[in-house]
Amino acid sequence: MSRPRASRPPVHLPDGVAEPDGLVDAVLAYETALLADDVEALDAAFAPGPDTLRGDASGLLVGSGAIADFRRGRGGIGPRTIERLEVRPIGEDAAVVVVTVAPASGGRGLLTQVWRRGVLIRPAEPGYSTSNRWLISVAQVAGPTPAIDGRVWRTVGSPLVAGAASGALLGQTIAVKDLFDIESFAVGAGNPSWLAEAAPADGTAPALAALLAAGASIRGIAQTDEFAYSIAGANPHYGTPPNPLVPGGLPGGSSSGPASAVASGQASIGLGTDTAGSVRVPASYTGLWGLRTTHDAVSRERLLPLADSFDTVGWLTRDGETLRLAAAATLGEGSIEPSPAYLIDSGLVAVADPSVQHAFAALTAGLAAETIDVGDIDELFETFRVVQAADAWIADGTWVTAHPGAVGPGTAARFKLAAAITHELADSARAAMRAHAARLDGLLGDSVLLLPSAASAAPSTTAPEVELDRVRAATIRLCCIAGLTGRPALSIPLMTVPGPFGGDAPVGLCLVGPRGSDVALVALGQRLAGQLG
């Protein structure tokens, strides 16, 4: 099969300015490498070193290493042609190149690049040298605007469903996780085979109806990890929603679509669910506020379940006040006031990556917090894991069994483990859960437990499965305290750590409060953010 090649378009320069020798050939070679997804050639086209830049609508990548890592996880581009090429020399060995491209799929894209020749790289750094070739030092990519980004949305409208004409949430827009009933729309659960068999709902989930009654409108139905059985944020059928705060990073799941939509400004409220961290983890990865509510405080009627013992409704927002208003619109303003005392378990925090531990210690150093010990963290995790898996098999096992091959490999592996849990093991784990909850309630009381919302910053979308499994296990160890006790947990974007591609990446500070303190916990978080931020 012949390799696609970029053809030479008309080249435009200012009157009297000569075309820089070899530059257009370098531009066309780069475009040819893009069309062929020749990763090695693409890497070689960028100036090596920490100062090379590449930006697009998803964010900015700094350094040639970060750009190369991103490219390996992106895949190739579709066929397209160069329509126009503008060259503006800015010296003997530098030029700005602006390229208009016409994708075969329609629309127009605009590429702006700074090319340099004879790029001098600090020779003391291993692998760096001086090159006399033309290389890209800055690239900005503006692709055609898609009618809908299928990684984020299943369907959208302007609005999809209008809310009430007045209320505390008037003007707010909701990205609804694809687990909630919306009248006249089917639930897809992140799986096309499930969606194909689903009937349109004959009513709307009360958790969503409360937001509509307060004046918010539905922007669209947002993607979810399959059956909500993941905290990574990847979906093998629809793709991985982009993380605007960490380009090339996972958005976190399973409320991945709502998180991506809110973080990118496409909606102001994400309506999600949290079983093992499915609101807190995406909030942490994408720099959002996120609240997992008290278990059973918000109706789960007309909500596709994953694990009845732990499933809760939650919200994702870009600021604390919008989150407080969403919580109050659903739960009312009446709320138990948590004690102003803070609790920290250093052994629990030690589950997180070292960079997160250091950021947490620095953030909380000025707080008067009591040290506690929640007990054997591995035992708590195992109890949670078994009960969650047993519940998940009750909820979805019959369908999964009847549809072999319909579920992606990661989710299928978790359902396979769930299927192997015996009734005796499940009963034993449920008894242990009740005992753990009683003991932890006595330990935590009405105080607020502080811990990281996730064990790490957002991993790369190309991270190996063994690394994702490690991060998942560590993060669920942090998240399971709220799950086992049914307590609300708030994630606030107050920490940053080195990201997977260099630069800073967000990590949330988590506040676990007493049951029924949901609205007051958000208000406490707002005050704490003002104090620490």
Give a label for each model feature:
Residues 1-48:
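Short, low-complexity N-terminal intrinsically disordered segments enriched in polar/charged residues
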Residues 3-4, 143-169, 332-476:
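Amidase signature
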Residues 53-54, 61, 65-108:
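Surface-exposed, charged secondary-structure patches
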Residues 89, 133-198, 228-229, 458:
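Short, well-ordered alpha-helical
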Residues 107-146:
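Short beta-strand edge/turn micro-motifs at domain boundaries
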Residues 139-147, 151, 264, 269, ...:
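Structural helix-boundary/capping segments
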Residues 173-310, 454-466:
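Short glycine/serine-rich loop/turn segments
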Residues 427-533:
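Glycine-rich, small-residue loops and helix-cap segments
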